[in-house]
Regions:
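Gly/Ser/Thr-rich loops at beta-strand to alpha-helix junctions
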Residues: 30-36, 144-149
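Short hydrophobic/aromatic-enriched beta-strand-loop microsegments
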Residues: 46-52, 158-168
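Glycine-rich phosphate-binding loop plus the immediately following alpha-helix
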Residues: 2-28, 36-92
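Adenine-nucleotide phosphate-binding core of ATP-dependent small-molecule kinases
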Residues: 87-130
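Glycine-rich phosphate-binding loops at beta-strand->alpha-helix junctions
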Residues: 137-154, 172
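Glycine-rich phosphate-binding/hydrolytic loop that grips phosphoryl groups
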Residues: 165-188
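Short, surface-exposed connector motifs at secondary-structure boundaries
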Residues: 132-138, 161
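Conserved active-site and cofactor/substrate-binding residues in soluble primary-metabolism enzymes
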Residues: 10-14, 52, 56, 93, ...
């Protein structure tokens, strides 16, 4: 076994089946507590996938560190600061970027949306940078809206790939629709 090819999928395949958009020959991103990046072939088969811990990191760092007073996850991330956080992380790394989130609040008096944008830009840097490196030209993004929209924005800003954002209702209903699809296959 090799660490770089070992991974687990526990339910995301059901969510994938329930999406109401064409996912053939695409990367499908399902941001959530465990964000999945799934490669789907031209004949609709899962051929590869990667898991990222961005959702849990976002929650843990924003709730259980000195950033808990700075990062409000109920805010809307400021797009300008998403880019600033992303670019800062590219130059200085995740640890310094996270601490600078606090500095922005303390010294520069950024508002909640700006602080949250910088924070999310930094946290998403590694995941976005990895996704951009894949050869697929088409990326479909569903999943939890709190991570979906910053992910879509940064992908559109920093890649030349076609980005399709699944609407919230379809993304939210995808697990149920996937179960119904599986049931219809098994029941036939």
């Amino acid at each position: 076994r090799k660490l770089e090819t070992a991974d687990v999928m526990r339910g995301e395949e059901t969510e994938l089946m329930g999406l109401n958009v064409d996912i053939t020959d695409s990367l499908v991103l399902l941001p959530g507590s465990h964000s999945k990046c799934i490669t789907v072939s031209s004949d609709s088969k899962i051929v590869d996938f990667h898991t990222y811990l961005t959702g849990e990191m976002t929650h843990a760092i924003s709730k259980d560190t000195i950033l808990s007073k700075t990062v409000n996850m109920k805010c809307e991330p400021d797009r300008k600061y998403l880019k600033i956080g992303y670019e800062y992380c590219a130059k200085k790394g995740i640890n310094e970027t996270l601490f600078k989130t606090r500095i922005l609040d303390m010294i520069f008096k950024t508002d909640g949306n700006q602080s949250y944008g910088f924070f999310m830009g930094g946290l998403l840097y590694g995941e976005i940078n990895r996704i951009i490196s894949f050869p697929q030209r088409r990326i479909v993004v569903a999943g939890k809206k709190e991570l979906k929209y910053p992910t879509v924005f940064l992908l559109k800003e920093y890649s030349e790939k076609e980005i399709i954002c699944v609407d919230d209702a379809s993304a939210d209903n995808a697990p149920t629709m996937g179960l119904l699809k599986i049931y219809s296959y098994v029941g036939s």
